[in-house]
Amino acid sequence: MDAELVVTPPGCAHLGSFKVDNWKQNLRAIYQCFVWSGSAEARKRKAKSCVCHVCGLHLNRLHSCLHCVFFGCFTKKHIHEHAKSKRHNLAIELMYGGIYCFLCQDYIYDKDIEIIAKEEQRKAWKMQGVGEKFSTWEPTKRELELLKHNPKRRKITSNCTIGLRGLINLGNTCFMNCIVQALTHTPLLRDFFLSDRHRCEMQSPSSCLVCEMSSLFQEFYSGHRSPHIPYKLLHLVWTHARHLAGYEQQDAHEFLIAALDVLHRHCKGDDNGKKANNPNHCNCIIDQIFTGGLQSDVTCQVCHGVSTTIDPFWDISLDLPGSSTPFWPLSPGSESSVVNGESHVSGTTTLTDCLRRFTRPEHLGSSAKIKCSGCHSYQESTKQLTMKKLPIVACFHLKRFEHSAKLRRKITTYVSFPLELDMTPFMASSKESRMNGQYQQPTDSLNNDNKYSLFAVVNHQGTLESGHYTSFIRQHKDQWFKCDDAIITKASIADVLDSEGYLLFYHKQFLEYE
């Protein structure tokens, strides 16, 4: 269905309580004094006065109430408590100037406020002697010609299918096609490429995978219906990830990790000059979206000293019941069997079960003693993994392919996965409230920072030796489509949730404003 002309919906309905006498003057004063702070004197005043009125700190995403003089931490919910007790539902974030509505539970957009914010930002930049991060767009001759031939502007409606496009299978390349579908429907990645944010610094842009992905996004969202032929993408993947070269069937999960790695390496120059305190920190779009932090706590069984390490991750690989992993806790009444070289387990396993198994303490045993820094000797220990930092997009890899010296098989155990997922119980901050790895329902229903929504599912049909990959993609909130190479068909939510599941892609429901 083509896009059609529509009237855009109104913004936040709760702004009326703020837009009263002299509201523009008051808002300009807030931006000048507490957000942009163009002069050195204003910056000193901001550093001195902008602290949380509850805890006295200024590092926890400080917000200012728009209805009264109150500064509060967003991370520690001090501004939330103020909003609830005073019924002051609007606040401004003091780092980037976003307006947050506590009734909408999200940052909101208002054209009038945006104009004031941009004007005050430009004034501050001028006082500081700096320019805008991105220059004003000037259309090329080719773009001017295109604009002449396309004078009407189209807006995407809830029934629009722009962005859905089939991909030609170039010879056992379904593993690549399903991952491309998931990446091109990742909201923040789509916004990055469609806003022309990539700045290629490679000597040969034709060998840059990020440039090719940018072209791919343009193809997907051009409105064309015919299947796209991703021959150049395949060539670049073969060039930069030699282990994937050739026309034999490959693992979709392996392709995902290889593609993210190449994109990460080719994104040099896209961080817009941002510098982190950690020189090893990368701020490219791939790391911003997909990188999380996995905390590993090793506890000595003698002195109970804890050694903690934090490692980055792009995906979370989860064991399944029916694998050769000896410590999988089968639920009462479950039975396992092997049929035609494939492992099956009766009963229903959930994604939460797999995450509970992933984050429970594991006794390392006497054969894996570590040298304890407290005891200064080798001792038995336990190891527990938790999430220190969650990525914007969480990819869960269900380990269905088992390779060992004795056997090679596919595990077809059905795993039930939800449309919405709360990762709070598996956070490092929730570890103390979880006894011996037992799952506990989070008590803070207002904590939305760790909540995710499903937007893509990759499935594998067939056996380990011969199979085929397809994917389900969420186009709008409740519209799903099945992508089978060049064929795109509409799917129901039941179709998605009843599928076997190999790779599950979840997107954060609420994002920090930046």
Curated annotation (Swiss-Prot):
Its EC number is 3.4.19.12. The modification Phosphothreonine is found at T136. It catalyses: Thiol-dependent hydrolysis of ester, thioester, amide, peptide and isopeptide bonds formed by the C-terminal Gly of ubiquitin (a 76-residue protein attached to proteins as an intracellular targeting signal). Gene3D superfamilies: Cysteine proteinases (3.90.70.10), Zinc/RING finger domain, C3HC4 (zinc finger) (3.30.40.10). It is found in: Nucleus; Cytoplasm. Zn(2+) 3 binds at C65, C68, H82, H88. It comes from the Eukaryota. One of its GO terms (biological process) is proteolysis. Zn(2+) 2 binds at C52, C55, C73, H78. The keyword DNA repair does not apply. The modification Phosphoserine is found at S226. Phosphorylated in G2/M phase, but not in G1 phase by CDK1. Ubiquitinated and subsequently degraded in a CDC20-dependent manner. The modification N6-acetyllysine is found at K118. It is an enzyme of class 3 (hydrolase). The active site is at C174 (nucleophile), H468 (proton acceptor). Zn(2+) 1 binds at C12, H14, C101, C104. GO terms for molecular function: cysteine-type deubiquitinase activity; zinc ion binding. A zinc finger (UBP-type) spans 10-127. Belongs to the peptidase C19 family. UBP8 subfamily. Component of some SAGA transcription coactivator-HAT complexes, at least composed of ATXN7, ATXN7L3, ENY2, GCN5L2, SUPT3H, TAF10, TRRAP and USP22. Within the SAGA complex, ATXN7L3, ENY2 and USP22 form a subcomplex required for histone deubiquitination. Interacts directly with ATXN7L3; leading to its recruitment to the SAGA complex. Interacts with ATXN7L3 and weakly with ATXN7L3B. Interacts with MED1. Deubiquitinase that plays a role in several cellular processes including transcriptional regulation, cell cycle progression or innate immunity. As part of the transcription regulatory histone acetylation (HAT) complex SAGA, catalyzes the deubiquitination of both histones H2A and H2B, thereby acting as a transcriptional coactivator. Recruited to specific gene promoters by activators such as MYC, where it is required for transcription. Facilitates cell-cycle progression by stabilizing CCNB1 and antagonizing its proteasome-mediated degradation in a cell cycle-specific manner. This is Ubiquitin carboxyl-terminal hydrolase 22. It comes from Bos taurus.
